[in-house]
Structures are given as structure tokens and as C-alpha cells.
Amino acid sequence: MKQYTVAVLGATGAVGQEMMKILAERNFPVGKLVPLASARSAGKTVKFKGQDVTIQEACDSAFEGVDIVLGAAENDIAKKFAPAIVKAGAVFVDNSSAFRLDPNVPLIVPEINPEDVKWHKGIISNPNCSTIITVTAVNALNKIATIQAMTASTYQAVSGAGAGGPIELQNEVEALRLGKTYEPKVFSYQIAYNLIPQIGGEQFEGYTSEEMKMQNEGRKIMHLPELKVSCTCVRVPVVRSHSISVSVYFDRHVTVEEARQVLKDAPGVKLVDDLPNLKFPMPLDTSDQDIVFVGRIRPDLVFDNGLRLWCCGDQVRKGAATNAIQIAELLVKE
């Protein structure tokens, strides 16, 4: 099998580290790994398949000879280096939001729209974490009845805000236990024993940027340009794995049993739906997994053509790193 030179842009961050871990787990054909980060991290090493690999400073020349670049950096870094990556002849699989809504850039969840990889022009975007988890859960239903609208409430883990999120939660819990105060640095308010119903800045009619991603990205991934989504995104004091409560509205009546049968066989999905025996998806059970768990399927009591469901998924893996590497796997199959 052909071996590929793979660069990880943002190799020292949580998603970048997870990408390298998953490359090894999935036996991706890496001939050479090129970890890239800021100048202050250059010269340090990361582990890959038991070997120490030296981190290089991210610069335009670092992409020469690279086949695939996995992006785990912020928007500004992605925008800065994208031209050099494309010029070098590499394919940039980018986890930032910089190019997601660009009509010339595919936005891909491999279980849903793998065919879109064929029209890339050097850049492929990885969707937002909560969007990936949600659309992976509902897309199978769209194959038996067209989804017209969705409402969603997300319960997003602190690690979704970066490595500092879990540290801040732990520090706040400890400070409260000791009767001390702790000034939040990562979140706008105390997250311990609290919920923060705001992720991202205001973007449209009181909706945040994170909330609008569910509609705008969902439309592009599922090829449903008229899809309407109303979403509320909430940060919760959970370390890892996002959860989403979703109401889905179809162009016809869909029974609970129909939905269960379809979801039972859906790629990337595990059905966990047995309320009498207290079997349903929970963040603790879905962490460090590469699939989306779906349960609590029931009729919507307001709209005749609606279903409600609950899904959970690891936002660092399927919501980011694993999805990006699945995209890279599509590239090497071409």
C-alpha cells in the first residue's frame, strides 16, 4: 500500500494529539508524520507509534512534500497557511470553521456525503462537533422521509472549549470545596455546578454563531438547502462528550419503530433505546468512542410528523479528529 506524508497542523492541541493517536489506531498509511505547531513548541517531541517525532514550526515551506495536512488549529492559522498548503499540492482537511460555508469547499461527514470528496480543490472542511454528532444521528431518517425542520438543544462538554476547559472545571470544584473563590478564565461564568446557555458570539436574531452552525452546516452536509433548524447551545459541567436533544420534522408520518429499524443499521450509529430498563445514551458511556449513540426515540406530541430523540458522541473523536481522518481515508481510496 502507498505510504503518505501526513502533517498535523496544531499538533500540540487536544484535537491534534487525538489525530495522531487515531492515525495509529486506524493504521492509516503514514510513511512520514510531520507535527507542526508554533515556534515555542518547535524542537519538542510527540509520540507516534512508540517513536519520538520532532515538532516543526508551522511555516509555508513546511508543507513541501506533504500529501495530506490535518488541520487542528484556529481559523486564523487555517486561513494563513491554506494557500501554501494548496500550492504545495497537499490536501488540507481542516477542522476549523474558516472554510465550512465556502461553496468551493466540501463539508463532509463520511457516513453521509462521502461523494463530495471528489470535487475538492485542495481544501476539505470538517464540520462543527455538535453538527457532526447530530446529523450522523438523523441522516438515516432522512433516507426514509425528507427532513424539513429540526429543533435542537445541545449539552456541550467543557473539553469542547479546549484543554483549559476541564482544568477550569476541576479548579472551580476544588475551590468551592475549600470555600475559596476562583476567577473564570476559559468561560464567561463559573461552570462548576452551573449551565451556561451561550457558546459563541451573537450572530443572527439572538442566535449565537455556534447555534447557527447547526442549520448552515446541516444544510450543506445533508444536501437539504431549505432545512430549517432552531438551536440552543449550552455549556455543561461534563468533561467529555456532547449530548443533543433533537426534534425532527418530516414530510410524512414516521413511526418510532420505523426510526429504530433504520437507526439500528445506520453507519456510525449505535442504537441504545430501552427506557423501561434504563438504557439510553450518556456522555460517560460514549467518551473515547468513534460512533454516535442514539436513544429516547419517541413521537413529538406537538407535531404529527415529528420525532424526538437524544444522541451523544465524543466531540474530540467523532466530532473532530476521527471524522477528519475518515475524510483522509476517503482521499487515499480515490
Language-model features: locations:
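N-terminal Rossmann-like NAD(P) cofactor-binding subdomain of oxidoreductases
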Residues: 1-191, 227-228, 261, 279, ...
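Generic solvent-exposed, charged/amphipathic alpha-helical segments
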Residues: 20, 215-219, 260, 264
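Glycine-rich beta-alpha junction loops
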Residues: 39-41, 129-130, 154-161, 195-203, ...
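Helix-loop-beta segment of a Rossmann-like dinucleotide-binding subdomain
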Residues: 118-125, 194-205, 309-311
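A glycine-rich, Thr/Ser-enriched phosphate-binding loop motif common to dinucleotide/cofactor-binding enzymes
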Residues: 122-133, 206-215, 319-323
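Oxyanion-binding "anion nests"
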Residues: 192-239
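C-terminal active-site/capping subdomain that shapes the small-molecule cofactor and substrate pocket
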Residues: 227-334
